[in-house]
């Protein structure tokens, strides 16, 4: 019989693995799209399609918008928009593995800041060791674009803000928080994408 106390941790680990797989695979797909569409267009359309899918999946129309804490949603959406855009800008200038390694400094910093128990530091150390083992040193031997590194670090900072903002009470469920935050992120990026010629590049 499974240990009921461990079930949520197993589920969280499983969902985390899926999330990381989706993140990295979407980065690879995005690099292909950069040949046909501006980076702003790709980032904005990703958030647009994501917000529509989540709105239908989690029935966003059932949300009591009077209960929504909009400051929390705005900070979450801003972090999400910055994380997506800056990450895409970084992988346009850097190899994917190197960009991800720099970006991971953000969430690792959050984990280190909130670490309280001995095992918390052990897990952070193992994560850093994993990054070192997976780091593409052969690609790093070539000159790296400083602006690409800056974009990756900026994406990591937004990722850290995304984690912290996601812990703040938003007045709605976690699923609806993600949906509304993604919609806010789309609203932030879409005007910039339209200004850069989204309708022409998409349609």
Which stretches of residues belong to each language-model region?
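Specific transmembrane alpha-helical segments of multi-pass solute transporters/efflux pumps
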Residues: 58-99, 131-133, 202-203
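Membrane-interface helix-boundary motifs at transmembrane edges
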Residues: 62-69, 109-119, 164-176
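Membrane-interface helix caps and helix-loop-helix hairpins in membrane proteins
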Residues: 88-93, 116-117, 137-146, 168, ...
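Specific alpha-helical transmembrane segments that line the substrate/conduction pathway
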Residues: 41, 48, 88-118, 155
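A helix-boundary/kink motif common to multi-pass secondary transporters
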Residues: 38-39, 95, 173-174
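Glycine-/small-residue-enriched transmembrane alpha-helix faces in small-molecule transporters
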Residues: 1-41, 75-78, 82-86, 129, ...
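Hydrophobic transmembrane alpha-helices of multi-pass small-molecule transport proteins
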Residues: 54, 105, 119-138, 155, ...
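Loop-to-transmembrane alpha-helix entry segments
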Residues: 67-69, 98-103, 113-134, 142-149
